Amino acid sequence: MMKIHLSRFAVTESEKSKCQEALHRILASGESGFPRIPEEELIWQQSLEVGSSLRRRFENLIVIGTGGSSLGTQVIASFRPGSRLRFLENVDGEAVDRVIHGLNLAVTGVLIVSKSGGTIETLAGTDALRETYERAGIGFYERCHVLTESESSALGKWAFQHQIPITRLAPDIGGRYSVLSQVGMIPACFDGYDLAAFRRGAEEALRRPDFVAELMTQFLASFHRQEWITFFWFYDPLARIAGLWLQQLWAESLGKKQDRRGHPAPRASTPMAGLGTVDQHSVLQQIIEGPRDKFVVFVRSEAAESRGAPLRRTEFVDCEPLQGKSMGVLLAVHGTANEQSLAQEGVSTLTLRTEVLDERGLGEMMMTMQMLVAGLGEILGLNPFDQPGVELGKRLAKDLLRKA
């Protein structure tokens, strides 16, 4: 269970009450279907059936999608050594070659994910991968499964034309809020994860609105202190991608020009993500001695800090204190030292702890963060479910492509 382990700032009952009311409003509004996911039997039934079918047929699965159609699933895949999932998400000339490297395409399925069914990067990636299969003399269409909202979209029509099965996505669950839907759960099932545990974790998060409201007060207080960079520092090596997923969720939901009434939007922070000791050797210097415009949120896992066999002996004098201890202990020590050093230098911090980021832990963390971001959007008067700033670039890219 996720909890606040260490906070330098007290929360008043008045502030918490306002956040509780805002969180209740946004979750009860029905504007987004993400809070409903744990109780939607169809989502879990389809995820299990489709994921199991793909698992029986194929040894590997390539997921084509970008942004919310990919990042959350990548988080899940990163927690299983030897994952059989590959991801085609970015547009570059060598992406397909990298993704298929070492794969036997004859036993590799393809899951194409686009909520709108018109994301040009996803459609282009599908074309590029199709041509790769065709050059290898391997049938492509019969190895595909499509996830999309509308069968009348470009992707939906293409799938119908080639008799490719389609799983329809709920129209009220946006991409960045969709990881616990079929978008993330079908690949998770393929990779052997326990879907029921994800579901339990999400249910646990929904039963703890008071905890989410307390988190909301912490972040709102950081905005009031003019801390406009929120740095999520994950101290679990398996959570490298989780920071990128959270970065998208936060930025697209809270970075708005206008509020719901069409007035200039209140400012929300820019998210950044860091990983354990790696970023103690990259961005820590700037955080400690740079401007006091950052709120550092440590996310620590008890399981990560107990992993590894004890070091029986060392051949380095500097490592003698580690003898008899695991690498997890070293990770824990560095995390605590980092917390203490930032506090001593006057940097605002918050530490969140969870026992283990397994299926249940991931389900809880992901639902908690989605509730947090939606609640912050509501209390700031923003729409946390749209992304109007992204649309202009899409339109310009299509115009430029026609002229290229």
Model-derived regions: residue spans:
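Glycine-rich phosphate-binding loops that contact phosphosugars or nucleotide phosphates
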Residues: 52-209, 395, 399
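Hydrophobic alpha-helical scaffolding
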Residues: 40, 86-89, 115, 119, ...
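Extended, charge-enriched "interface" segments that sit outside catalytic cores
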Residues: 1-52, 312-322, 337, 376
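Flexible loop/turn segments at secondary-structure boundaries
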Residues: 69-72, 94-95, 118-121, 152-156, ...
